Amino acid sequence: MRIDNTLSLPMPPDAAWALLLDIPYIAPCLPGTQLTATIDDRRYQGTVSLRLGPIALTFEGEAEITDIDEAARRVTVRAQGRENRGRGSAHADVSFQVCERDGGTEVAVSTDLTLAG
């Protein structure tokens, strides 16, 4: 499934770009996300809890920054995990694109999400 979102930030694009690359700083801004370990400067372990209708799921896994394009202000993250009750798995490729908009910043977020189990 593909999910596309945008968000507006009242700051210059360069400042937003710097924050976007600080995963421990921005992780608490992502609903249901909790970092549990930093493996290195591009890989992190954590949990993501979400609801799909009446179903509540918590996935434990790893996220890795797979590409950083400084010139385009685009970063790509690959995340994968297993549901903590062992019933399923999730895999997501997420790209964040930072652009200047109306004196502030717009961040376009594109997610390709696969759930199994």
Q: Model regions: which residues?
A:
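Hydrophobic ligand-binding cavity/cleft-lining segments
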Residues: 1-43, 51-53
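Intrinsic-disorder/low-complexity, polar/charged segments enriched in Ser/Thr/Lys/Arg/Asp/Glu/Gln
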Residues: 2-8, 43, 58-60, 74, ...
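Generic structural detector for well-ordered beta-strands
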Residues: 6-10, 49-51, 64, 97-99, ...
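Short small/polar-residue motifs
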Residues: 28-34, 60-64, 93
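Alpha-helix N-cap/helix-start motif
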Residues: 29, 56-58, 87-88
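Glycine-rich portal/gate segments that line the openings of hydrophobic small-molecule binding cavities
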Residues: 38-81
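Beta-strand/loop substructures that line and gate deep hydrophobic ligand-binding cavities in soluble
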Residues: 67, 81-117
